[in-house]
């Protein structure tokens, strides 16, 4: 793959710090490749276990001539009271482990600081995940501009920005069931308090961690967003203004994965043979398959997963159902075989136990809809593939993303999930959508009503504008140029 040479007196050197969770790492590796294609020297700093997950994709990028360097730092699991190898969020099972994980992450400050000190050429810019607040201190110490990456879209980022400045709105609510309207917003949008990713109830041991993140956000030089202007124009404009002009939409970054093998291995090697998967899809009618995936950190209880399975079966439509974190669901595996579910659906249902080649599946012509947890990466991949979505948010920014997809973009059908899946309280929450609810929502999404046809038309249109945004002359391609010019001017004035 050719990359554009930087005809500047010295090359820019960006150091990237991905947070160790799949939804954060995947787009950051894509960003590394996008910047390297523009002639920027890239160093990615991560831990051994996480480096292994991206080895194949990065090796292919490096072999194609892209200037990417991967540096590994030892993960201090012992000091934080974790097991060896627990280096990624999807390997944690309790809230206590997550607290310990953040403790371990912040212990990386010293070894990383030593790395930066000895780096040559000197870094021109740090791009850090929002969860790695320690990088702010390093940026300050070495006087390097730090760009923040949140992994969210402009709609959600603006919502968080507005609510942090108007916190009394959340404080004055009488209960977690009461809805409020987000003020100063381009559209009338309502949420309950738990549905927005703003720090309201802070669990024990988290106050300092969250305060550090908010402070790191405030002191960063700017923000890059995995979105594109044409998707959420009013929100991109308002968010850029809120960040004094230093916000660049450069997505969908997943579109840097142009070859099949990169699409298939994006994030983690798949647990299904790529050819087997494509063969199954090839045997189905165009637009007939529903792809079902609730993300890498799905915490639905067994009772809810059974209802989802039965609803998919009763919909009588072909589907692919991805269940990640398979080890956690031993009872589900037993139910699949003992209840005869697997036998009954074998002709029209494909179960993927573990990782799936998501981008490859979504871009296949047989797929006509996407049942998603509305994580931002998945939402954007659905949009990029031009697919209407059935939305089933769990937590974090996912209720915000659902609102964008269903209410603003009008390319989604809601499964009508109103309650946030709190870690450790899943069983207590129980079933939120029964099999009838699942069947009804699938029919609404995949059926032939006028509304369904209009959703498909709009989704296809958005998919086309996503591809145009990253092409030369497109809004996201141009924004990368503006970002590089900004950092180059800064580097020259500092010299």
From Swiss-Prot:
CDD domains: GT1_Gtf-like. UDP-alpha-D-glucose binds at residues 296, 356-358, 373-381, 395-398. It comes from the Eukaryota. GO terms for molecular function: quercetin 3-O-glucosyltransferase activity; quercetin 4'-O-glucosyltransferase activity; quercetin 7-O-glucosyltransferase activity; UDP-glucosyltransferase activity. Pfam families: UDPGT. GO terms for cellular component: endoplasmic reticulum. This is UDP-glycosyltransferase 73C6.
């Amino acid at each position: 793959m050719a990359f554009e040479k930087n005809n500047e007196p010295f090359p820019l050197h960006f150091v990237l710090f991905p947070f160790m969770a799949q939804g954060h790492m995947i787009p950051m590796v894509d960003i590394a490749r996008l910047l390297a294609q523009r002639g920027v020297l890239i160093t990615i700093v991560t831990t051994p276990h996480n480096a292994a997950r991206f080895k194949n994709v990065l090796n292919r990028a490096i072999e194609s001539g892209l200037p990417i360097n991967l540096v590994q730092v030892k993960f201090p699991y012992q000091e934080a009271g974790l097991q060896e190898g627990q280096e990624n969020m999807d390997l944690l099972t309790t809230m206590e482990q997550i607290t310990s994980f953040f403790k371990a992450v912040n212990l990386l400050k010293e070894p990383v600081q030593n790395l930066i000190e000895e780096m040559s050429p000197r870094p021109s810019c740090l791009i850090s995940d929002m969860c790695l607040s320690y990088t702010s201190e390093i940026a300050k110490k070495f006087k390097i501009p730090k760009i923040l990456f949140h992994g969210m879209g402009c709609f959600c980022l603006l919502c968080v920005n507005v609510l942090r400045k108007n916190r009394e709105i959340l404080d004055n609510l009488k209960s977690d069931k009461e809805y409020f309207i987000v003020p100063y917003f381009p559209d009338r949008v309502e949420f309950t308090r738990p549905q927005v990713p703003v720090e309201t109830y802070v669990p024990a041991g988290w106050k300092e961690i969250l305060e550090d993140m908010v402070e790191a956000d405030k002191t960063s030089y700017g923000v890059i967003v995995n979105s594109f202007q044409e998707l959420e124009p009013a929100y991109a404009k308002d968010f850029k203004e809120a960040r004094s002009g230093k916000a660049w939409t450069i997505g969908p970054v997943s579109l840097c994965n142009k070859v099949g093998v990169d699409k298939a291995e994006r994030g983690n090697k798949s647990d299904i043979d790529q050819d087997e998967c494509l063969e199954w899809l090839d045997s189905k009618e165009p637009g007939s398959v529903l792809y079902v995936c609730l993300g890498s950190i799905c915490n639905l209880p067994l009772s809810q997963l059974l209802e989802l399975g039965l609803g998919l079966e009763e919909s009588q439509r072909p589907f692919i159902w991805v269940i990640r974190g398979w080890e956690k669901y031993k009872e589900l595996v037993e139910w699949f075989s003992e209840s005869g579910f697997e036998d009954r659906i074998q002709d029209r249902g494909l179960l993927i136990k573990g990782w799936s080649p998501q981008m490859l599946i979504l871009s296949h012509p047989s797929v006509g809809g996407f049942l998603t947890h509305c994580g931002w990466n998945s939402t954007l991949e659905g949009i990029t593939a031009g697919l209407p979505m059935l939305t089933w948010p769990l937590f974090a920014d996912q209720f915000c993303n659902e609102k964008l997809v269903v209410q603003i973009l009008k390319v989604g059908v809601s499964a009508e999930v109103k309650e946030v899946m709190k870690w450790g309280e899943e069983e207590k929450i129980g079933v939120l959508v029964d099999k009838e609810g699942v069947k009804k929502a699938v029919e609404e999404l995949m059926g032939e009503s006028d509304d369904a046809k209009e959703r498909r038309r709009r989704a296809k249109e958005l998919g086309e504008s996503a591809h145009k945004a990253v092409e030369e002359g497109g809004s996201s391609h141009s924004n990368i140029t503006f970002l590089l010019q900004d950092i180059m001017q800064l580097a020259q004035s500092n010299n």
